[in-house]
Amino acid sequence: MASTGPTNIQEKTTCPVCQELLTKALSLGCGHLVCQACLISNKNAVINPRGKSSCPVCGTRFSLENLQANKHLANVVERLGEVKLKPDIGTKRDLCVHHGEKLLLFCKEDKKVICWVCERSQEHRGHHTFLWEEAVRECQENLQKALTRLRKEQEKVETLEADIKEDRLSWKRQVQTERQRIQTGFNQLRRILDKEEQRELKRLREEEQMILDSLAGAEAELAQQSQLVEELISDLELRREWSDTELLQDMSGILKWSQIWTLKKPKAVSKKLSMVFQAPDLSGMLQKFRELSAVRAYWDNFTFNPENLNLNLILSEDHRQVTSVSIWPFKCCNNGILGSKCFSSGKHYWEVDVSEKNAWTLGVYTRKRTLRFDVRQRKGQPNGYHRYKPQNGYWVIGLQHGSKYSIFEDSSNCDPTVLNPFVATPLHRVGIFLDCEEGTVSFLNVTNHGSLIYKFSQCCFSQPAYPYFNPWDCPAPMTLCPLNS
């Protein structure tokens, strides 16, 4: 640990009595230092009969037996004496230019290295002087303190530089992430636009072919009629060359035929396209695509459950496709099949391909109570749709008769309330999103970029919820879509 401060050499090494370097310095009780000879010879330091004496400087009494020699100061004085007796010790650059003495002291006021003679001169009288080693040590300590402080400042600079570097890297990462997000968004838009373009062009080609086929049929029919009327005209012109007798005898037949013949106009073809292209809402399409991507993060990979499989249903080898076959002569109104997983908490999503089917039912089922269905066939509900109600544990939608989409909601009677939503794009691929905590079941039209078909709210899942499927009697397959397909 550094010392609190260097000692004033001038004050410590000078005898207050003789004003010379201390010789055999004695430390009095009052703190003054005097030469042993000065203490004995000084008339003010009279020794009384009790062995008491007084300080020649301040007069403070002290006991002779308490006198102590100051060995440290004696060593300092001895070194100063050696310098005085041996002025040639050391190199010339360590000698005082004025007195030729070795430079061993440092004057604090003048900031100069001086010799012991300079220290006693009028120029430096009253100044604070210190041993050269102590001044150097203090300077080294100050340098060390400054160095320590600057190193700490350097560490702060390095820390700030590292922070700036990290900020630069972080900013670059943020920019890169945003760049990728922008590129991904526009790539999604391009894919959506390309898909929409191909769909619109396909629809236009189909309409074009239908109109051209109609026009070709009308053209062929007109060609036949044109040929027939040309033959009639030619026949009538020939008959004009006949004799009067021949003309009168055969006139009735040809005239009758020519009079009853009339032109059959072909079926009129519309001169306008049935649908005029309108640019899609890109922001809306992208928003739907993002929402679809968000729910796809909860994709659950499962298969159809082969247990308790209806005899009219056949599963593929991987249990991801179910097909209805007419093995039994009677129709079964309960072709339902469950998924291989059940859910009691969390969020879950799956997709089903129904592109080839003209009848299907999809959704979520949970066991609530033993259902007692009316065994009598109900008029208007001969195929078992009456079971599909949330209060019976079914949250489902379906397709009937190839074009009629239905949503089965609760009602006050035995039959469900059937809603028929407008679906702009046929449902070839349907997404089902189950949120057990929120109590919702959502159906998405994946074919139309994930647009919402319907959402059941306030669903009560008192028992585990199962994915539910019913392919009905339609022989086309129903397929569980694999992840990222």
Swiss-Prot record:
Its EC number is 2.3.2.27. Keywords: Antiviral defense, Coiled coil, Cytoplasm, Metal-binding, Mitochondrion, Transferase, Zinc, Zinc-finger. InterPro entries: B30.2/SPRY, B30.2/SPRY_sf, Butyrophylin_SPRY, ConA-like_dom_sf, SPRY_dom, TRIM/RBCC, TRIM34_PRY/SPRY, Znf-RING_euk. GO terms for molecular function: transferase activity; zinc ion binding. It is found in: Cytoplasm; Mitochondrion. GO terms for cellular component: mitochondrion. Zn(2+) binds at residues 96, 99, 118, 124. A zinc finger (B box-type) spans 91-127. It is an enzyme of class 2 (transferase). It comes from the Eukaryota. SMART domains: BBOX (SM00336), RING (SM00184), SPRY (SM00449). Gene3D superfamilies: 2.60.120.920, Classic Zinc Finger (3.30.160.60), Zinc/RING finger domain, C3HC4 (zinc finger) (3.30.40.10). Residues 282-485 form the B30.2/SPRY domain. It holds the Pfam family zf-B_box. A zinc finger (RING-type) spans 15-58. Disruption phenotype: Trim34a- and TRIM34b-deficient mice show an impaired integrity of the inner mucus layer. Homotrimer. Interacts (via B-box and SPRY domain) with TRIM5. Functions as antiviral protein and contributes to the defense against retroviral infections. Acts as a capsid-specific restriction factor with the help of TRIM5 and prevents infection from non-host-adapted retroviruses. During influenza A virus infection, promotes programmed cell death by targeting ZBP1 for 'Lys-63'-linked polyubiquitination. In turn, promotes ZBP1 recruitment of RIPK3 to mediate virus-induced programmed necrosis. Negatively regulates the function of mitochondria by enhancing mitochondrial depolarization leading to cytochrome c release and mitochondria-dependent apoptosis. This is E3 ubiquitin-protein ligase TRIM34B. It comes from Mus musculus (Mouse).
